[in-house]
């Protein structure tokens, strides 16, 4: 199914096919526009395909129904509206921060004592298999199924939906809620509210296209298969990142020395036939001896657009999953600032090999966030608000080595030591200059950077595969959850050849 859908396969296309986002009959007549929110107007409606009907949520199969959440569920309830005292280590206390897209995150879970839990659970008795939906805050609309066998308490920021299992499959409705159409419906339900919130009343009124139970299960199974593939890719990526982190800790501290290579790329061997490894002591210098530091040009996010000169906002450094930015490769996606270049101090214009640090972070881990600029063609690139630009004063460091050398545990601990502030951690140019960096000879820097770059390339390949799989799933959701592709025929599961 995954392979066929990725190639545009449509198992229901006996007398119609999808062409340019529209259904086309064999006689060439287009029948239905593929509208993103599936809200088709009853005014001037196009011809409805045979076996389909027009409803308030769009065109769906004739044997499907449109049903509100309150009529699908045995119970819909949110958690406690009174914050309990944390501690006691008896029962898990789950809030919206623990509900992710399709899973429960227990990394930073809190616990409460038995007395408080019993009082909460009496009203909000969430069970295994219930659907958990965030209803407050920035994560509103995130949902997952409860896969925990133990009792736990919920905060009011999360509601649970208990579907009638004799008629409805919770896995199917999880996919409906997480779909583009489901998220749009939630967004519209929250419109007009000063605070981002989804009330129980609004949840009860959420409306979904509903096939019979066998087809619900077939659709949920097909989409769950893709979810499993995405989860496996996530695991591989996480493992690769752990391997990279361990390799950096070994290679960037000199604990492990790499074998040397000759100019032709072959390993250098000693007389006994063993690889010759790099040796010798590493240098240590303060960053102030290696770099000249300066600030960026202040401009708000609102001033940025798609025209002008490339502009590096400190928020984009925080959000980046990389330690470098390639101007030529990423030019289209880099925000621009429309400004006369002579208004920008030359120290704020980023050159190839410059390192840019953030000077403020909401958490300690973010205080060492940085990127290395790859700009061989010297495109104008402006370093922005809350950035500290580091320009080399010496040729001690390779540009490729810079991408990794600031990611060691030792460097991060020094950043945390010099950072100041409570809610927001900040670091000054003066304090960054005091940080000490250990580094090897330039040939060894090159060898280290090559090994770590290869690992980065592997991670990037898996990330690209994951993103492609996610796009395929989005296409599957659009087709399966609206009935454009049917997995059930004459009441029986279709079998692929």
PLM region spans:
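A short beta-sheet element
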Residues: 95-96, 112-178, 313-315, 330-407
């Amino acid at each position: 199914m995954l392979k066929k859908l990725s190639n545009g396969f449509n198992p229901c296309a006996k007398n119609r096919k999808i062409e340019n986002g529209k259904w086309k009959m064999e006689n060439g007549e287009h029948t239905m526009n593929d509208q993103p929110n599936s809200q088709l107007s009853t005014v001037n409606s196009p011809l409805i395909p045979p076996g389909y009907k027009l409803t308030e949520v769009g065109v769906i199969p004739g044997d499907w129904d449109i049903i509100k959440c309150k009529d699908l569920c045995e119970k819909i309830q949110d958690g406690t509206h009174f914050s309990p005292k944390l501690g006691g280590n008896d029962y898990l206390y789950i809030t919206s921060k623990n509900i992710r897209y399709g899973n429960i995150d227990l990394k930073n879970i809190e616990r409460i004592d038995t007395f408080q839990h019993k009082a909460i659970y009496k009203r909000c008795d969430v069970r295994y298999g219930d659907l958990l939906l965030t209803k407050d805050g920035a994560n509103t609309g995130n949902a997952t199924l409860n896969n925990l066998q133990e009792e736990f308490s919920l905060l009011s920021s999360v509601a649970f939906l208990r579907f009638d299992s004799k008629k409805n499959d919770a896995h199917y409705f999880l996919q409906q809620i997480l779909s583009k159409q489901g998220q749009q419906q939630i967004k519209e339900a929250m419109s007009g509210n000063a605070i981002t919130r989804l009330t129980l009343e609004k949840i009860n009124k959420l409306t979904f296209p509903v096939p019979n139970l066998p087809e619900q299960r077939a659709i949920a199974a097909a989409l769950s298969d893709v979810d499993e593939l995405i989860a496996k890719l996530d695991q591989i990526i996480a493992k690769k990142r752990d391997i990279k982190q361990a390799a950096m800790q070994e290679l960037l501290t000199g604990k492990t020395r790499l074998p040397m290579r000759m100019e032709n790329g072959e390993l250098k061997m000693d007389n006994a036939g063993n690889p010759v490894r790099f040796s010798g002591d590493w240098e240590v210098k303060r960053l102030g001896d290696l770099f000249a530091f300066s600030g960026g040009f202040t401009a708000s996010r609102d001033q940025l657009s798609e025209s002008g000169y490339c502009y590096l906002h400190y928020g984009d450094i925080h959000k980046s999953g990389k330690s470098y930015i390639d101007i030529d490769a990423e030019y289209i996606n880099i925000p621009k600032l429309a400004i006369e270049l002579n208004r920008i101090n030359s120290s704020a214009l980023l050159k190839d090999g410059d390192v840019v640090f953030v000077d403020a972070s909401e958490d300690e881990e973010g205080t060492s966030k940085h990127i290395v600029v790859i700009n061989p063609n010297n495109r104008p690139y402006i370093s922005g608000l809350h950035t500290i630009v580091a320009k080399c004063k010496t040729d001690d460091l390779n540009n490729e080595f810079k991408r990794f050398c600031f990611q060691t545990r030792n460097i991060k601990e020094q950043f945390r030591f010099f950072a100041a502030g409570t809610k927001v951690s900040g670091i000054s140019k003066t304090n960054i200059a005091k940080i000490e960096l250990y580094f090897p000879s330039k040939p060894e820097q090159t060898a280290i950077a090559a090994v770590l770059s290869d690992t980065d390339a592997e991670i990037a390949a898996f990330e690209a595969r994951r993103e492609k799989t996610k796009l395929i799933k989005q296409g599957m959701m659009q087709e399966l959850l609206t009935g454009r592709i049917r997995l059930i025929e004459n009441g029986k599961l279709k079998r692929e050849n």
